[in-house]
Regions:
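Active-site beta->alpha loop and helix N-cap motifs at the rims of alpha/beta catalytic domains
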Residues: 1-56, 188-189
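Flexible C-terminal active-site loop/helix
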Residues: 177-206
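Conserved short secondary-structure transition element at the edge of the structured enzyme core
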Residues: 153-187
């Protein structure tokens, strides 16, 4: 897959711990090192702690992975706040770090390049504005702009009780006038009720 990405001009791929089985840190390091021997595509080391095996990578393991020549970035989050912050502090001097753990203002102060968000799929102006304020050092204002949208957005998103991410992005895309397709099972589009669609349209109008 990495070779295909390289062939079609993709610059960067996410590399995380394996998904289905109990994760042993040395297993993760061994297989990512092996992949690197067969491709020149860039790696973004990804701590995928919130689904699948729920392996929450330690900063020590992340630091070993960014020593692999392909590694140029880290998509960093953690279920443990101490691990999250230590990851920011120790990885930022070495690679481009994309914040995947909240604390947008603080992470930007530490030197994160940007943050992960689904919102640009349907309302990019929201995150452009937040990022612009972060870059200007207007952190209080950035947090307010972020919270004013994200708190009601998260409330709506959490009411969509089914697996997956596309299933809650698609109705927002549709409300914004974009083509969104359908979800694959086990994600069930039927759980997005008319009331949820109404709440989505109301939020985007505001």
């Amino acid at each position: 897959m990495c070779q295909l990405c390289e062939d079609v001009g993709i610059d960067l791929v996410q590399m995380s711990g394996h998904y289905y089985y109990t994760v042993v840190p040395d297993d993760v390091i061994a297989w990512i090192e092996e992949v690197s021997k067969h491709t020149n595509v860039g790696f973004a080391i990804y701590n995928h702690f919130y689904s699948g095996s729920k392996y929450d990578m330690s900063v020590d393991v992340a630091e070993r992975l960014i020593e692999i020549p392909n590694s140029v970035a880290a998509k960093w989050g953690s279920g443990d706040r101490s691990n999250l912050i230590q990851g920011f502090k120790r990885l930022i001097p070495k690679v481009a770090v994309i914040n995947n753990g909240g604390l947008q203002a603080y992470a930007h102060m530490l030197g994160c390049k940007s943050y992960i968000s689904h919102v640009p799929n349907f309302y990019p102006q929201q995150d452009w504005k937040v990022y612009e304020l972060l870059e200007q050092g207007k952190y209080t204002e950035a947090e307010k702009v972020f919270d004013d949208f994200m708190i009601p957005y998260t409330r709506i998103r959490n009411s969509i009780n089914t697996a997956g991410e596309g299933v809650f992005v698609r109705p927002f895309m549709e409300a914004a006038g974009l083509k969104a397709g359908i979800s694959r099972l086990p994600s069930r589009d039927v759980v997005v009720t008319p009331e949820i669609h109404t709440a989505i349209r109301s939020l985007l109008k505001n």
